[in-house]
């Protein structure tokens, strides 16, 4: 697999991730189960975005010094584009988590604990998926067309789908887990397992954690091929992807109280998926430059947020008039 990643770059990335996760887990252990405040969520979100941009700047500087700007510029731009794509698509994942926590009545103080382990699991699973996907593409280049068609289909499906938490309990995964795990009827504080009468029982909190991991895998099937449309370099795909999801937990608590204010966002994400799908399908006829792709994705998100703000304004105006 061709990659710009050197041992120094891989090592630097690993050190940053391990240090930040260690700090996060240490704070979680000291404070115990508690809900992240809006102020804390905003602070952590800003920190993760800043850290991602600083990493990209260091990445660009290293490549510029070792291989020249003709290599550094497009690679740093590819990281930024991949990061923006993953960050925007991750918002839809946040809304699914909201439905899961609401359906299973998980208190805010326990949601953070679930998401800590959820993000750790996502790091492992996505790393495996990215390396497997990169290897498959290098062996079977025609898979890019399959990914493109899949993203096109997914984009249309996302625009037409209706979000409803009432059907979560009937999903095959939930029914299978409930049928095969000895499980308590209620959440037992912050425990995933408890002992009763000498027997080990899973709690509904474990079920929620498994569903959080499962939902992330489903969304990764969309987002990882989307980044492959920008670059197939495993270093850039992995680092941009993981930096985006490392800030996902903070993003969840930032958006959890205002999710209903982003009703138009899924349509913007759908358009992004359709654009990326088309980009992959026409690659043999016309190669869309990375800078153009970044501009299109950023433009779609900006237009979507403007429309969303207008819709919210009209809705609020109607409510005030009643």
From Swiss-Prot:
Subcellular location: Cell inner membrane
UniProt-listed InterPro entries: Integral_membrane_TerC (IPR005496), Integral_membrane_TerC_rswitch (IPR022369)
Keyword entries, A-Z: Cell inner membrane, Cell membrane, Membrane, Transmembrane, Transmembrane helix
Stretches assigned to the Cytoplasmic side: 28-43, 111-113, 157-198, 247-261, 308-321
Topology, Periplasmic side: 1-6, 65-89, 135, 220-225, 283-286
Bilayer topology annotation: Multi-pass membrane protein
Bilayer-spanning residue ranges: 7-27, 44-64, 90-110, 114-134, 136-156, 199-219, 226-246, 262-282, 287-307
GO CC term (a single one): plasma membrane
PANTHER family listed in its UniProt record: MEMBRANE BOUND PREDICTED REDOX MODULATOR, THYLAKOID MEMBRANE PROTEIN TERC, CHLOROPLASTIC
Function recorded in the entry: Has been proposed to be a redox modulator.
Assigned protein family: Belongs to the TerC family.
Protein name: Putative membrane-bound redox modulator Alx
Native species: Salmonella typhimurium (strain LT2 / SGSC1412 / ATCC 700720)
Organism taxonomic ancestry: Bacteria, Pseudomonadati, Pseudomonadota, Gammaproteobacteria, Enterobacterales
């Amino acid at each position: 697999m061709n990659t710009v990643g050197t041992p120094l770059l891989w090592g630097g990335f690993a050190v940053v991730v391990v240090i930040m996760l260690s700090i996060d887990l240490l704070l979680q252990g000291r404070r115990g189960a508690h809900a992240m405040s809006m102020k804390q969520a905003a602070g952590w979100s800003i920190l993760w975005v800043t850290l991602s941009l600083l990493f990209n700047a260091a990445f660009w500087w290293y490549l510029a010094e070792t291989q020249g700007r003709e290599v550094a510029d497009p690679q740093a731009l590819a990281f930024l584009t991949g990061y923006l794509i993953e960050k925007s698509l991750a918002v839809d994942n946040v809304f699914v988590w909201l439905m899961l926590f609401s359906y299973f009545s998980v208190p805010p103080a326990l949601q953070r604990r679930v998401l800590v382990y959820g993000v750790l699991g996502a790091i492992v699973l996505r790393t495996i998926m990215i390396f497997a996907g990169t290897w498959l593409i290098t062996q079977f280049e025609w898979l890019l067309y399959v990914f493109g068609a899949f993203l096109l289909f997914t984009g249309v499906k996302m625009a037409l789908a209706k979000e409803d938490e009432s059907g979560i309990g009937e999903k095959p995964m939930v029914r299978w887990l409930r049928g095969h795990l000895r499980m308590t009827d209620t959440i037992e504080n912050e425990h995933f397992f408890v002992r009763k009468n000498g027997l080990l029982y899973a709690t509904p909190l474990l079920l929620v954690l498994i569903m959080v991991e499962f939902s992330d895998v489903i969304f990764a099937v969309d987002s990882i091929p989307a980044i492959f449309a920008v670059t197939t370099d495993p270093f850039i795909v992995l680092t941009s992807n993981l930096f985006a999801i490392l800030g996902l937990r903070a993003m969840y608590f930032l958006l959890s109280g205002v999710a209903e204010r982003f009703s138009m966002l899924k349509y913007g994400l759908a358009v992004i998926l359709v654009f990326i799908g088309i980009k992959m399908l026409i690659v043999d006829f016309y190669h869309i430059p990375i800078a153009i792709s970044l501009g299109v994705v950023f433009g779609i998100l900006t237009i979507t947020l403007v429309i969303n703000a207008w819709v919210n304004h009209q809705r609020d105006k109607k409510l005030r008039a009643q």
